[in-house]
From Swiss-Prot:
The species this protein was found in: Severe acute respiratory syndrome coronavirus 2
Name of the protein described by the UniProt record: ORF6 protein
Any one GO CC term of the record: host cell endoplasmic reticulum membrane
Keywords, ordered alphabetically: Host endoplasmic reticulum, Host Golgi apparatus, Host membrane, Host-virus interaction, Inhibition of host innate immune response by virus, Inhibition of host interferon signaling pathway by virus, Inhibition of host STAT1 by virus, Inhibition of host STAT2 by virus, Interferon antiviral system evasion, Membrane, Viral immunoevasion, Virulence
Entry coiled-coil feature ranges: none
Membrane in keyword set: yes
Effect annotated for changing residue 58 to A: Loss of interaction with human NUP98-RAE1 complex which suppresses the mRNA accumulation in the nucleus, the down-regulation of protein expression of newly transcribed genes in the host cell and blockade on nuclear import on a broad range of host factors
Annotated compartments: Host endoplasmic reticulum membrane; Host Golgi apparatus membrane
Molecular function as annotated in GO: protein sequestering activity
Cited function: Disrupts bidirectional nucleocytoplasmic transport by interacting with the host RAE1-NUP98 complex. Disrupts cell nuclear import complex formation by tethering karyopherin alpha 2 and karyopherin beta 1 to the membrane. Retention of import factors at the ER/Golgi membrane leads to a loss of transport into the nucleus. Prevents STAT1 nuclear translocation in response to interferon signaling, thus blocking the expression of interferon stimulated genes (ISGs) that display multiple antiviral activities. Suppresses IFN-beta production possibly by blocking IRF3 nuclear translocation. May play a role in viral double membrane vesicles networks to enhance viral replication.
């Protein structure tokens, strides 16, 4: 019979083997993910357009 716990353990073992072969630790992975998120958030929050406050409102006749 198929057991979910056995499946989860085998997935975890496979991930550990992959991480050992590529010499990636959980701490390094966390650091890399944080760097990616920080760079993405910086690029998204950069203001490339003029502020609405600086623009002149249109006059309606």
């Amino acid at each position: 019979m198929f057991h979910l716990v056995d499946f989860q353990v085998t997935i975890a073992e496979i991930l550990l083997i992959i991480m050992r072969t590529f010499k990636v630790s959980i701490w390094n992975l966390d650091y890399i993910i944080n760097l990616i998120i920080k760079n993405l958030s910086k690029s998204l929050t950069e203001n490339k357009y003029s502020q609405l406050d600086e623009e002149q409102p249109m006059e309606i006749d």
